[in-house]
Curated annotation (Swiss-Prot):
Disulfide bonds listed in the record: none
Protein family (similarity comment): Belongs to the WhiA family.
Lineage top rank: taxon: Bacteria
Lineage: Bacteria, Bacillati, Bacillota, Bacilli, Bacillales
GO aspect biological process, one term: regulation of sporulation
Protein name: Probable cell division protein WhiA
Keyword hit for Lyase: no
DNA-binding region per UniProt: 274-308
Keywords in alphabetical order: Cell cycle, Cell division, DNA-binding
Task performed by this protein: Involved in cell division and chromosome segregation.
GO molecular function annotations of the record: DNA binding
PANTHER family named among the record's database cross-references: CELL DIVISION PROTEIN WHIA-RELATED (PTHR37307:SF1)
Length: 314
Protein backbone atom coordinates (compact mmCIF):
# COMPACT_ATOMS: atom_id res chain seq x y z
CA UNK A 1 0.00 0.00 0.00
CA UNK A 2 1.06 3.59 -0.60
CA UNK A 3 1.81 6.05 2.18
CA UNK A 4 -1.43 7.93 1.35
CA UNK A 5 -3.51 4.71 1.46
CA UNK A 6 -2.01 3.70 4.80
CA UNK A 7 -2.79 7.14 6.15
CA UNK A 8 -6.42 7.02 4.97
CA UNK A 9 -6.83 3.58 6.53
CA UNK A 10 -5.63 5.05 9.82
CA UNK A 11 -7.98 8.04 9.59
CA UNK A 12 -11.04 5.84 9.01
CA UNK A 13 -10.48 4.12 12.37
CA UNK A 14 -10.74 7.32 14.44
CA UNK A 15 -13.66 7.42 16.88
CA UNK A 16 -15.69 10.64 16.75
CA UNK A 17 -18.80 11.98 18.47
CA UNK A 18 -21.91 12.84 16.46
CA UNK A 19 -21.14 16.50 15.73
CA UNK A 20 -17.65 15.64 14.48
CA UNK A 21 -19.05 12.70 12.51
CA UNK A 22 -21.43 15.12 10.76
CA UNK A 23 -18.58 17.50 9.92
CA UNK A 24 -16.50 14.67 8.45
CA UNK A 25 -19.44 13.23 6.50
CA UNK A 26 -20.37 16.69 5.21
CA UNK A 27 -16.94 17.02 3.58
CA UNK A 28 -17.07 13.47 2.18
CA UNK A 29 -20.49 13.93 0.57
CA UNK A 30 -19.90 17.51 -0.59
CA UNK A 31 -16.74 16.45 -2.42
CA UNK A 32 -17.59 12.93 -3.64
CA UNK A 33 -21.38 12.84 -3.53
CA UNK A 34 -24.08 13.32 -6.16
CA UNK A 35 -27.86 13.58 -5.94
CA UNK A 36 -29.96 11.85 -8.59
CA UNK A 37 -33.61 11.02 -9.18
CA UNK A 38 -34.60 7.37 -9.59
CA UNK A 39 -38.18 6.12 -9.75
CA UNK A 40 -39.39 9.49 -8.49
CA UNK A 41 -37.09 9.14 -5.50
CA UNK A 42 -33.98 11.15 -4.63
CA UNK A 43 -30.81 9.05 -4.31
CA UNK A 44 -27.43 10.02 -2.84
CA UNK A 45 -24.37 8.32 -4.38
CA UNK A 46 -20.95 8.85 -2.76
CA UNK A 47 -18.04 7.50 -4.80
CA UNK A 48 -14.51 6.57 -3.73
CA UNK A 49 -11.66 4.31 -4.87
CA UNK A 50 -10.65 3.49 -1.30
CA UNK A 51 -12.45 0.54 0.33
CA UNK A 52 -11.85 1.73 3.90
CA UNK A 53 -13.18 5.19 3.02
CA UNK A 54 -16.31 3.55 1.60
CA UNK A 55 -16.78 1.63 4.85
CA UNK A 56 -16.30 4.88 6.78
CA UNK A 57 -19.00 6.64 4.75
CA UNK A 58 -21.33 3.67 5.24
CA UNK A 59 -20.84 3.61 9.02
CA UNK A 60 -21.17 7.40 9.43
CA UNK A 61 -24.47 7.54 7.52
CA UNK A 62 -25.86 4.55 9.42
CA UNK A 63 -24.78 5.99 12.75
CA UNK A 64 -26.00 9.56 12.26
CA UNK A 65 -29.19 9.01 10.24
CA UNK A 66 -30.01 5.35 10.89
CA UNK A 67 -31.02 4.74 7.27
CA UNK A 68 -30.34 1.87 4.90
CA UNK A 69 -27.09 2.21 2.94
CA UNK A 70 -25.76 -0.11 0.25
CA UNK A 71 -22.23 -0.35 -1.14
CA UNK A 72 -21.84 -1.07 -4.86
CA UNK A 73 -18.54 -2.09 -6.44
CA UNK A 74 -17.68 -1.15 -10.01
CA UNK A 75 -14.54 -1.86 -12.03
CA UNK A 76 -12.80 1.20 -13.47
CA UNK A 77 -12.35 0.66 -17.21
CA UNK A 78 -9.78 3.35 -18.06
CA UNK A 79 -6.06 3.24 -17.25
CA UNK A 80 -5.67 1.58 -13.83
CA UNK A 81 -8.57 -0.81 -13.48
CA UNK A 82 -9.16 -0.12 -9.80
CA UNK A 83 -12.42 -0.80 -8.03
CA UNK A 84 -14.82 2.08 -7.54
CA UNK A 85 -16.99 1.90 -4.42
CA UNK A 86 -20.36 3.66 -4.40
CA UNK A 87 -22.23 4.22 -1.15
CA UNK A 88 -25.91 4.69 -1.96
CA UNK A 89 -28.87 5.69 0.16
CA UNK A 90 -32.41 6.28 -1.06
CA UNK A 91 -33.97 7.19 2.28
CA UNK A 92 -34.34 10.82 3.45
CA UNK A 93 -31.79 11.94 0.86
CA UNK A 94 -32.77 15.62 0.83
CA UNK A 95 -33.06 15.70 4.61
CA UNK A 96 -29.54 14.26 4.97
CA UNK A 97 -28.06 16.84 2.59
CA UNK A 98 -29.94 19.62 4.33
CA UNK A 99 -28.74 18.57 7.79
CA UNK A 100 -25.14 18.39 6.56
CA UNK A 101 -25.30 21.94 5.15
CA UNK A 102 -24.96 20.77 1.53
CA UNK A 103 -28.49 21.57 0.36
CA UNK A 104 -30.34 24.76 1.28
CA UNK A 105 -33.81 25.62 -0.01
CA UNK A 106 -33.36 22.97 -2.69
CA UNK A 107 -30.08 24.48 -3.92
CA UNK A 108 -26.63 22.90 -3.62
CA UNK A 109 -24.19 24.98 -1.57
CA UNK A 110 -20.53 24.55 -2.53
CA UNK A 111 -19.08 26.66 0.28
CA UNK A 112 -18.21 25.08 3.62
CA UNK A 113 -21.29 25.49 5.79
CA UNK A 114 -20.53 27.40 9.01
CA UNK A 115 -22.55 24.92 11.08
CA UNK A 116 -20.05 22.18 10.13
CA UNK A 117 -17.00 24.04 11.46
CA UNK A 118 -18.36 25.62 14.64
CA UNK A 119 -15.47 24.57 16.88
CA UNK A 120 -11.91 23.26 16.71
CA UNK A 121 -12.83 19.56 16.74
CA UNK A 122 -15.41 20.01 13.97
CA UNK A 123 -12.91 21.95 11.85
CA UNK A 124 -10.37 19.14 12.25
CA UNK A 125 -13.05 16.57 11.40
CA UNK A 126 -14.10 18.48 8.29
CA UNK A 127 -10.48 18.59 7.10
CA UNK A 128 -10.15 14.86 7.79
CA UNK A 129 -13.25 14.17 5.69
CA UNK A 130 -11.92 16.41 2.93
CA UNK A 131 -8.62 14.51 2.89
CA UNK A 132 -10.41 11.15 2.81
CA UNK A 133 -12.52 12.40 -0.11
CA UNK A 134 -9.92 14.11 -2.27
CA UNK A 135 -6.57 14.08 -0.51
CA UNK A 136 -3.20 12.72 -1.59
CA UNK A 137 0.29 12.95 -0.15
CA UNK A 138 3.59 12.00 -1.77
CA UNK A 139 5.60 9.15 -0.31
CA UNK A 140 8.26 11.07 1.65
CA UNK A 141 10.84 8.34 0.92
CA UNK A 142 10.78 8.72 -2.86
CA UNK A 143 9.76 12.24 -3.85
CA UNK A 144 9.46 15.87 -2.87
CA UNK A 145 7.16 16.88 -0.03
CA UNK A 146 3.63 17.52 -1.31
CA UNK A 147 0.12 17.15 0.14
CA UNK A 148 -3.03 18.26 -1.65
CA UNK A 149 -6.81 18.09 -1.43
CA UNK A 150 -8.70 18.18 -4.74
CA UNK A 151 -12.20 19.63 -4.99
CA UNK A 152 -14.41 20.08 -8.05
CA UNK A 153 -15.60 23.46 -6.82
CA UNK A 154 -13.25 26.42 -6.68
CA UNK A 155 -15.05 28.22 -3.84
CA UNK A 156 -14.99 25.02 -1.75
CA UNK A 157 -11.26 24.60 -2.45
CA UNK A 158 -10.68 28.22 -1.42
CA UNK A 159 -12.65 27.51 1.76
CA UNK A 160 -10.42 24.50 2.50
CA UNK A 161 -7.32 26.63 1.94
CA UNK A 162 -8.64 29.26 4.33
CA UNK A 163 -9.57 26.60 6.89
CA UNK A 164 -6.09 25.05 6.70
CA UNK A 165 -4.49 28.45 7.08
CA UNK A 166 -6.50 29.13 10.23
CA UNK A 167 -4.01 26.65 11.71
CA UNK A 168 -0.99 28.46 10.23
CA UNK A 169 -0.29 25.81 7.56
CA UNK A 170 0.65 28.23 4.76
CA UNK A 171 -1.62 26.35 2.33
CA UNK A 172 -1.84 27.53 -1.27
CA UNK A 173 -4.73 27.35 -3.74
CA UNK A 174 -4.36 26.35 -7.38
CA UNK A 175 -6.87 25.86 -10.20
CA UNK A 176 -6.67 22.63 -12.18
CA UNK A 177 -8.42 21.46 -15.35
CA UNK A 178 -11.33 19.72 -13.64
CA UNK A 179 -11.31 21.55 -10.32
CA UNK A 180 -9.01 23.15 -7.77
CA UNK A 181 -6.55 22.03 -5.11
CA UNK A 182 -5.49 23.26 -1.70
CA UNK A 183 -1.90 22.14 -1.19
CA UNK A 184 1.11 22.14 1.15
CA UNK A 185 4.78 21.93 0.09
CA UNK A 186 6.63 22.39 3.39
CA UNK A 187 7.56 19.24 5.30
CA UNK A 188 6.91 20.88 8.67
CA UNK A 189 3.42 22.05 7.61
CA UNK A 190 2.55 18.61 6.24
CA UNK A 191 3.53 17.13 9.61
CA UNK A 192 1.29 19.68 11.34
CA UNK A 193 -1.62 18.77 9.06
CA UNK A 194 -1.20 15.03 9.70
CA UNK A 195 -1.34 15.71 13.43
CA UNK A 196 -4.28 18.08 13.00
CA UNK A 197 -6.54 15.46 11.39
CA UNK A 198 -5.43 12.60 13.66
CA UNK A 199 -2.96 10.76 11.42
CA UNK A 200 -0.46 10.09 14.20
CA UNK A 201 1.03 6.84 12.82
CA UNK A 202 1.46 8.51 9.43
CA UNK A 203 3.04 11.48 11.22
CA UNK A 204 5.60 9.25 12.97
CA UNK A 205 6.56 7.56 9.70
CA UNK A 206 6.71 10.91 7.89
CA UNK A 207 8.95 12.41 10.59
CA UNK A 208 11.25 9.36 10.61
CA UNK A 209 11.75 9.63 6.85
CA UNK A 210 12.12 13.40 7.06
CA UNK A 211 14.89 13.13 9.69
CA UNK A 212 16.81 10.56 7.63
CA UNK A 213 16.44 12.65 4.46
CA UNK A 214 17.57 15.83 6.19
CA UNK A 215 20.58 14.03 7.67
CA UNK A 216 21.47 12.54 4.28
CA UNK A 217 21.19 15.95 2.62
CA UNK A 218 23.38 17.51 5.33
CA UNK A 219 26.02 14.80 4.88
CA UNK A 220 25.92 15.20 1.10
CA UNK A 221 26.35 18.96 1.39
CA UNK A 222 29.25 18.47 3.79
CA UNK A 223 30.91 15.89 1.52
CA UNK A 224 30.44 18.12 -1.53
CA UNK A 225 31.94 21.06 0.35
CA UNK A 226 34.89 18.98 1.57
CA UNK A 227 35.42 17.58 -1.94
CA UNK A 228 35.38 21.07 -3.45
CA UNK A 229 37.88 22.30 -0.85
CA UNK A 230 40.08 19.25 -1.43
CA UNK A 231 40.01 19.80 -5.18
CA UNK A 232 41.03 23.44 -4.68
CA UNK A 233 43.86 22.36 -2.35
CA UNK A 234 45.13 19.70 -4.77
CA UNK A 235 44.93 22.07 -7.73
CA UNK A 236 46.85 24.77 -5.86
CA UNK A 237 49.47 22.26 -4.69
CA UNK A 238 49.99 20.98 -8.24
CA UNK A 239 50.56 24.51 -9.52
CA UNK A 240 53.02 25.19 -6.68
CA UNK A 241 54.98 22.00 -7.42
CA UNK A 242 55.12 22.85 -11.14
CA UNK A 243 56.46 26.31 -10.29
CA UNK A 244 59.08 24.87 -7.90
CA UNK A 245 60.20 22.30 -10.49
CA UNK A 246 60.62 25.07 -13.07
CA UNK A 247 62.67 27.16 -10.61
CA UNK A 248 64.84 24.10 -9.80
CA UNK A 249 65.44 23.54 -13.50
CA UNK A 250 66.19 27.15 -14.47
CA UNK A 251 67.81 28.62 -11.35
CA UNK A 252 68.31 25.86 -8.80
CA UNK A 253 66.64 25.83 -5.40
CA UNK A 254 69.97 26.34 -3.64
CA UNK A 255 70.13 29.85 -5.11
CA UNK A 256 66.87 30.87 -3.40
CA UNK A 257 66.71 32.74 -0.08
CA UNK A 258 66.60 30.34 2.88
CA UNK A 259 62.89 30.89 3.69
CA UNK A 260 61.84 30.22 0.06
CA UNK A 261 64.21 27.28 -0.41
CA UNK A 262 62.91 25.51 2.69
CA UNK A 263 59.22 25.92 1.84
CA UNK A 264 59.91 24.84 -1.78
CA UNK A 265 61.55 21.59 -0.65
CA UNK A 266 58.83 20.91 1.91
CA UNK A 267 56.08 21.42 -0.67
CA UNK A 268 57.70 19.03 -3.18
CA UNK A 269 58.26 16.40 -0.48
CA UNK A 270 54.76 16.78 1.04
CA UNK A 271 52.38 17.59 -1.82
CA UNK A 272 49.28 16.21 -0.08
CA UNK A 273 49.35 18.22 3.15
CA UNK A 274 47.66 21.53 3.96
CA UNK A 275 49.27 24.95 4.30
CA UNK A 276 48.75 24.79 8.06
CA UNK A 277 50.64 21.49 8.24
CA UNK A 278 53.44 22.88 6.07
CA UNK A 279 53.77 25.85 8.41
CA UNK A 280 54.26 23.52 11.37
CA UNK A 281 57.26 21.88 9.66
CA UNK A 282 59.39 25.05 9.31
CA UNK A 283 62.77 24.46 11.00
CA UNK A 284 62.98 27.89 12.63
CA UNK A 285 59.58 27.42 14.25
CA UNK A 286 55.95 27.19 13.10
CA UNK A 287 54.58 29.95 10.87
CA UNK A 288 50.96 30.77 10.11
CA UNK A 289 48.92 29.55 7.17
CA UNK A 290 49.05 33.04 5.66
CA UNK A 291 52.84 33.07 6.09
CA UNK A 292 53.17 29.80 4.16
CA UNK A 293 50.80 31.08 1.49
CA UNK A 294 52.87 34.26 1.14
CA UNK A 295 56.09 32.28 0.52
CA UNK A 296 54.45 29.93 -1.97
CA UNK A 297 52.95 32.90 -3.79
CA UNK A 298 56.47 34.35 -4.09
CA UNK A 299 57.61 31.09 -5.69
CA UNK A 300 54.68 31.19 -8.15
CA UNK A 301 55.52 34.80 -9.06
CA UNK A 302 59.16 33.83 -9.61
CA UNK A 303 58.12 30.96 -11.89
CA UNK A 304 55.82 33.31 -13.85
CA UNK A 305 58.77 35.66 -14.45
CA UNK A 306 60.83 32.74 -15.72
CA UNK A 307 58.03 31.74 -18.11
CA UNK A 308 57.71 35.29 -19.45
CA UNK A 309 61.48 35.73 -19.82
CA UNK A 310 61.74 38.56 -17.31
CA UNK A 311 64.98 39.37 -15.52
CA UNK A 312 65.27 37.49 -12.24
CA UNK A 313 66.59 39.19 -9.13
CA UNK A 314 66.98 37.10 -5.98
Amino acid sequence: MSFASDMKNELTRIDVDESNAKAELSALIRMNGALSLSNQQFVINIQTENATTARRIYSLIKRIFNVEVEILVRKKMKLKKNNIYICRTKVRAKEILDELGILKNGIFVHDIDASMIKDDEMRRSYLRGAFLAGGSVNNPETSSYHLEIFSQYENHSEGLTKLMNSYGLNAKHLERKKGSIAYLKEAEKISDFLSLIGGYQALLKFEDVRIVRDMRNSVNRLVNCETANLNKTVSAAMKQVESIQLIEQEIGLDNLPDRLREIAKLRVEHQEISLKELGEMISTGPISKSGVNHRLRKLNELADKIRSGEKIEL
